[in-house]
């Protein structure tokens, strides 16, 4: 039956005799079989018996079977098939219930899966599934490790903004290093497409009264401020409906700040939040209440109430140039380190700052006594790390009330990143990373914000929100640990190493990131000279004390005996977004690009 179906699909392509490598690749695509060209090329070479660069229909069938008929899938199929040829709908339902932990399962659902994935018409009409169909199902999105429920916004989005982790970028305009690299609109577009909700804009006076964006006092190139916000306007809500915060690093004169205010209002129109929401006069609004809104984060003159009362009056009337105004209106005069040059705030720009007023962090005690609900702090990673070790309870209390942004230290001229996990552990909402720099920190960032539909907002765990909680990530005294078991079964079409001596020698590392006690990793043995279908069949167990903060990272490396192991691909996701059962893990490159069909095949089980 399968042979008849197979021949009916391919025989027309062999009417002219043999086919070459390119036609082989196209025929596999026609059959909906995903295979990377580099692996097809090698398998083609191995099965071209006459070594003429052309293969027969029988040789193509051998290639097809090598690619699609994986031993580990056949073993599962045979376990549930009564005759090792087909699965009845009841057999499939049993598999989904017992192995895939399907909460709701019936023959009707099994019928739907059969209709969707079974390619052989007569088998499909009989409400049965062949190995061909089962293989296609196991290779589908429905069997990915990442839960379908987490692909949509499922969390309560009506909490105040300070109750969420918010995807945030640092120096968003840069696509390289911070001294000589180019400033590029792609930095903003790329970040927004990835779900970033807080963008940094470094603003300076430009020629012809046009503010520019670049890394000040460096040789990085410049962008017009109005061009930057036009790009943001175009892409702001392409990935997520929830609010975007524009974090202004404002070095402009009052005259060019007024130009900035005009540009913001002209570009964003009604999307720009320029006054308090009626329902939130003294608390931060929720992401839900701020859908499709742009928020400006900057220094501000006076209070929200004063701004609200001033609305409708001439916003160009007073730029607060007089030094005597400083006592009445805090934030008018700023000093940069030991320099005496003061920066004045244009009232027109100040009035656009509503719920995200930038306020210098002084101390936790000062914040408790004086900080207003709409005031946000930005703290450098070095100071934040020191505070998190010496005053962790105060830090967590602070992040329960106020939006806190953590940014990379100034010495990271190469745009490198810190590990964001240590600051998520204490509830910091905006942990700002250099999105242009690939590596472990961005893998964690991308993995964490896969959750909640990639919306860029993730509700913090209750113990980082509730005032009665005494959570300390370094001293876990209570909670409900999870025992996570992962059987790493096999790899599927893994990338090849660049080494000429050990191509195809691969291993997998499984890492856990979370509170300090949960940080751990384990790795498989090396499989030699088989990147196409390595079989490990190794089982690993992890005890995870705070699963709400845990991320799991799978890393595939090529063994390197002299220069060290070579990174080949990775996948990171929140522990609580992992499906149980037999699952496929897609791999991504260091730059975050999909390496499909390269993937891992695992069996996952966990209990709390």
Swiss-Prot record:
Instruction: Report the residue ranges that make up the EF-hand domain in this protein.
Output: 35-70
User: Do you know which InterPro entries this protein is assigned to?
Assistant: C2_dom, C2_domain_sf, EF-hand-dom_pair, EF_hand_dom, PI-PLC_fam, PLC-like_Pdiesterase_TIM-brl, PLC_EF-hand-like, PLipase_C_PInositol-sp_X_dom
Q: Highest taxon of the source?
A: Eukaryota
* Reaction catalysis annotation: a 1,2-diacyl-sn-glycero-3-phospho-(1D-myo-inositol-4,5-bisphosphate) + H2O = 1D-myo-inositol 1,4,5-trisphosphate + a 1,2-diacyl-sn-glycerol + H(+)
What EC number(s) is this enzyme filed under? 3.1.4.11
Give the protein's cofactors. Answer: Ca(2+)
Q: Got a GO cellular component term for this one?
A: cytosol
Q: In this entry, which stretches build a coiled coil?
A: none
Instruction: Please provide the record's free-text comment about the domains of this protein.
Output: The EF-hand and C2 domains are essential for triggering Ca(2+) oscillating activity and the regulation of PLCZ1 enzyme activity.
Q: How does it assemble?
A: Interacts via its C2 domain with PtdIns(3)P and, to a lesser extent, PtdIns(5)P in vitro.
Q: Where is the PI-PLC Y-box domain?
A: 349-465
Q: Which keywords are on file for this protein?
A: Calcium, Cytoplasm, Developmental protein, Disease variant, Fertilization, Hydrolase, Lipid degradation, Lipid metabolism, Nucleus, Transducer
The PI-PLC X-box domain covers 155-299
Q: Which disease is it linked to?
A: Spermatogenic failure 17: An autosomal recessive infertility disorder due to failure of oocyte activation and fertilization by sperm that otherwise exhibits normal morphology.
Q: Which GO terms describe its biological process?
A: calcium ion transport; egg activation; intracellular signal transduction; lipid catabolic process; positive regulation of cytosolic calcium ion concentration; positive regulation of cytosolic calcium ion concentration involved in egg activation
Q: Name one Pfam family in it.
A: PI-PLC-Y
Instruction: Provide the residue span(s) of the region labelled Disordered.
Output: 305-324
In the UniProt annotation, what is the result of changing residue 489 to F?
In SPGF17; loss of function in egg activation
State the name under which the record lists this protein.
Answer: 1-phosphatidylinositol 4,5-bisphosphate phosphodiesterase zeta-1
* Tissue/organ expression: Expressed specifically in testis and sperm. Weakly expressed in pancreatic-duct cells. Up-regulated in pancreatic-duct cells from patients with cystic fibrosis.
Q: Please state every residue range assigned to the domain named C2.
A: 465-589
Q: Relate the protein's function as given in its record.
A: The production of the second messenger molecules diacylglycerol (DAG) and inositol 1,4,5-trisphosphate (IP3) is mediated by activated phosphatidylinositol-specific phospholipase C enzymes. In vitro, hydrolyzes PtdIns(4,5)P2 in a Ca(2+)-dependent manner. Triggers intracellular Ca(2+) oscillations in oocytes solely during M phase and is involved in inducing oocyte activation and initiating embryonic development up to the blastocyst stage.
Question: Could you tell me which species this protein originates from?
Answer: Homo sapiens
Q: Which GO terms describe its molecular function?
A: calcium ion binding; phosphatidylinositol-3-phosphate binding; phosphatidylinositol-4,5-bisphosphate binding; phosphatidylinositol-4,5-bisphosphate phospholipase C activity; phosphatidylinositol-5-phosphate binding
Active site annotation, chain numbering? 170, 215
Q: Where located?
A: Nucleus; Cytoplasm, Perinuclear region
């Amino acid at each position: 039956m399968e042979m008849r179906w197979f021949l009916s699909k391919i025989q027309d392509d062999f009417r002219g005799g043999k086919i070459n490598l390119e036609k082989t690749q196209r025929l596999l695509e026609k059959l909906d079989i995903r295979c990377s060209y580099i692996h097809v090329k090698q398998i083609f070479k191995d099965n071209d018996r006459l070594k003429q660069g052309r293969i027969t229909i029988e040789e193509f069938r051998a290639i097809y079977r090598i690619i699609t008929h994986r031993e580990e899938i056949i073993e599962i199929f045979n376990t549930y098939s009564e005759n090792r040829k087909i699965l009845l709908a009841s057999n499939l339902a049993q598999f989904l219930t017992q192995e895939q932990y399907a909460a709701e399962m019936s023959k009707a659902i099994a019928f739907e899966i059969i209709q969707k994935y079974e390619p052989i018409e007569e088998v499909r009409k009989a409400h049965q599934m062949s190995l061909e169909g089962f293989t296609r199902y196991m290779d589908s999105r429905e069997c990915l490790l990442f839960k379908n429920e987490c692909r949509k916004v499922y969390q309560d989005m009506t909490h105040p903004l300070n109750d969420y982790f918010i995807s945030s970028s640092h120096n968003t305009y840069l696509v390289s290093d911070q001294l000589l690299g180019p400033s590029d609109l792609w930095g903003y577009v790329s970040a927004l497409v990835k779900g970033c909700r807080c963008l940094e804009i470094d603003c300076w006076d430009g020629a012809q009264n046009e503010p520019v964006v670049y890394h000040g006092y460096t040789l990085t190139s410049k962008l017009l401020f109005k061009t930057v916000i036009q790009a943001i306007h175009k892409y702001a809500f392409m990935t997520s409906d929830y609010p975007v915060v524009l974090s202004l690093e404002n070095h402009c004169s009052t005259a060019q700040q007024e130009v900035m205010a005009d540009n913001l209002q002209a570009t964003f129109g009604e999307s720009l939040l320029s006054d308090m929401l009626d329902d939130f006069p003294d608390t931060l609004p929720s992401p839900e209440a701020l859908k499709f809104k742009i928020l400006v984060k900057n220094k501000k003159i006076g209070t929200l109430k004063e701004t609200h009362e001033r609305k409708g009056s001439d916003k160009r009337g007073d730029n607060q140039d007089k030094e005597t105004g400083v006592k009445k209106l805090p934030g008018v005069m700023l000093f940069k380190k030991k320099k005496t040059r003061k920066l004045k705030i244009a009232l027109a720009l100040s009035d656009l700052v509503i719920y995200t007023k930038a306020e210098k962090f002084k101390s936790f005690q000062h914040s408790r006594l004086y900080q207003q609900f709409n005031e946000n702090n930005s703290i450098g990673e070095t100071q934040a790390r020191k505070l998190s070790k010496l005053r962790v309870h105060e830090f967590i209390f602070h992040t329960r009330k106020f939006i806190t942004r953590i940014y990379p230290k100034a010495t990271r001229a190469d745009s490198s990143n810190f590990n964001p996990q240590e600051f998520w552990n204490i509830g910091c909402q905006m942990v700002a990373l250099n999105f242009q720099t690939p590596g472990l920190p961005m893998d964690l960032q991308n993995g964490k914000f896969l959750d909640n539909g990639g919306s860029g907002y993730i509700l913090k765990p209750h113990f980082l929100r509730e005032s009665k909680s005494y959570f300390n990530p370094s001293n876990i005294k209570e909670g409900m640990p999870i025992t996570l078991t992962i059987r790493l079964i096999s790899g599927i079409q893994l990338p090849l190493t660049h080494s000429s001596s050990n191509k195809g020698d691969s291993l997998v590392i499984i890492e856990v990131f979370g509170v300090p006690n949960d940080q751990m990793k384990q790795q498989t043995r090396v499989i030699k000279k088989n990147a196409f279908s390595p079989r490990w069949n190794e089982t690993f167990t992890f005890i995870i004390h705070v699963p709400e903060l845990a991320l799991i990272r799978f890393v595939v490396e090529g063994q390197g005996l002299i220069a060290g192991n070579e990174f080949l691909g990775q996948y990171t996701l929140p522990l609580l977004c992992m499906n149980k059962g037999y699952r496929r893990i897609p791999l991504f490159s260091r730059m975050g690009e999909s390496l499909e069909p390269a993937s891992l095949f695992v069996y996952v089980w966990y209990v709390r």
